[in-house]
């Protein structure tokens, strides 16, 4: 299996719950390494640019409002099969559908306030990582 990089965002709801350490610990326990990290308070424009792919969807405005409502922790995770591994750790988008023991089952409140974001493909990961990080900010292990 190839070593990959994926973007993960710990969203405002999980930051407010002081769940950053618990979530990062799950990534590390699963064999993912943190190659980059920064805490940010996104502007609505920042959130809108990041989620531009969803611009035509009915939830876009609320998503941008939520993602700019408080600080987030943006990380680049690295490891074998990192994209799929991160998505498995996160669980289903709607925490009501998330398997027990996943991040969303344990920390999310709703489909909107669902604790974490993770890239869904290698192409998306490359774009998402470049949205937040320059090459000099990412460190291979």
UniProtKB/Swiss-Prot annotation:
Catalytic reaction list: a 2'-deoxyribonucleoside 5'-diphosphate + ATP = a 2'-deoxyribonucleoside 5'-triphosphate + ADP; a ribonucleoside 5'-diphosphate + ATP = a ribonucleoside 5'-triphosphate + ADP
Q: Which GO terms describe its biological process?
A: CTP biosynthetic process; GTP biosynthetic process; UTP biosynthetic process
| Entry-linked Pfam families | NDK
Compartments, as annotated in UniProt: Cytoplasm
What are the GO cellular component annotations? cytoplasm
Entry binding sites for ATP: 11, 59, 87, 93, 104, 114
Q: Which InterPro entries match?
A: NDK-like_dom (IPR034907), NDK-like_dom_sf (IPR036850), Nucleoside_diP_kinase (IPR001564)
Query: Which is one GO molecular function term here?
Result: ATP binding
Q: Which cofactor does it need?
A: Mg(2+)
Q: Which SUPFAM superfamilies match?
A: Nucleoside diphosphate kinase, NDK
Catalytic machinery residues: 117
Where mainly found? cytoplasm
Q: What is its EC number?
A: 2.7.4.6
The alphabetical list of record keywords is: ATP-binding, Cytoplasm, Kinase, Magnesium, Metal-binding, Nucleotide metabolism, Nucleotide-binding, Phosphoprotein, Transferase
Q: How would you summarize the oligomeric state and partners of this protein?
A: Homotetramer.
Task: Relate the protein's function as given in its record.
Answer: Major role in the synthesis of nucleoside triphosphates other than ATP. The ATP gamma phosphate is transferred to the NDP beta phosphate via a ping-pong mechanism, using a phosphorylated active-site intermediate.
Q: What is this protein called?
A: Nucleoside diphosphate kinase
Originating organism: Acidithiobacillus ferrooxidans (strain ATCC 23270 / DSM 14882 / CIP 104768 / NCIMB 8455) (Ferrobacillus ferrooxidans (strain ATCC 23270))
């Amino acid at each position: 299996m190839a070593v990959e990089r994926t973007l993960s965002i710990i969203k405002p709801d999980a930051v407010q719950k002081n769940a950053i350490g618990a979530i990062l610990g799950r990534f590390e326990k699963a064999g993912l390494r943190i190659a980059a990290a920064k805490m940010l308070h996104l502007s609505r424009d920042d959130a809108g640019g990041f989620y531009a792919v969803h611009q035509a969807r009915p939830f876009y405005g609320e998503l941008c409002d939520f993602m700019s409502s408080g600080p987030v922790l943006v990380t680049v995770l690295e490891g074998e099969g990192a994209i799929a591994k991160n998505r498995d750790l996160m669980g289903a988008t709607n925490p009501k559908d998330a398997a027990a023991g996943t991040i969303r089952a344990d920390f999310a409140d709703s489909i909107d306030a669902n604790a974490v974001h993770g890239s869904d493909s290698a192409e998306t990961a490359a774009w998402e990582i470049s949205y937040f990080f320059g090459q000099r900010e990412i460190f291979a292990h």
